[in-house]
Amino acid sequence: MGRVRLLTEGDVTQLLPMSLALETVESVFRWQAAGQTVNKPRVRLRAPKGFLQVMPAVVPEVGAMGLKAYTVVAGRVRFVVPLFSTETGELIGILEADRLGQVRTGAASGVATKYLARPDADVVGCYGTGYQAETQLEAICAVRRIRRIQVYGRDPE
């Protein structure tokens, strides 16, 4: 087996700017629409003190297959993505994936905004101030000239 790369949360943050995430998510959406990917629904398994959830996928265009797995234990969620070569089946990388999921989710909203929002849209509303809000807004601002952001949350701050 070749060298396996481990990317930490810090590595992912450094290596995955929103511009790259937008480009990649748009490409994968195109491949998915063309039937060139395999993406299965989430599998949820109950554990004595929490849950394990797994989402497998294959993307031949990039030579990778893998899964996103995450645990929910004591109110804490942790994500990891092991990736394998579609050519050899070898493990090629393991990514800590909290930030990856956050950026990917934001990028999906950015791609949707690019194609579905009016070209002159310059105001965005964001419901919620939690984990996903920052990258949702970052991605939308990357594809539209946003002049005003209205954020709605349960807490005044």
Task: Label the model's feature ranges.
Residues 17, 132, 151-155:
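Short, contiguous, pocket-lining structural segments
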Residues 143-157:
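NAD(P)-binding Rossmann-fold cofactor-contacting core
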Residues 38, 69, 131-133, 156:
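Short, flexible micro-motifs
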Residues 1-102, 110, 120:
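N-terminal ligand-binding/catalytic initiation module
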Residues 126-127, 152:
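Structural motif
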Residues 104-124, 131-143:
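Short internal alpha-helix immediately C-terminal to a glycine-rich phosphate-binding loop
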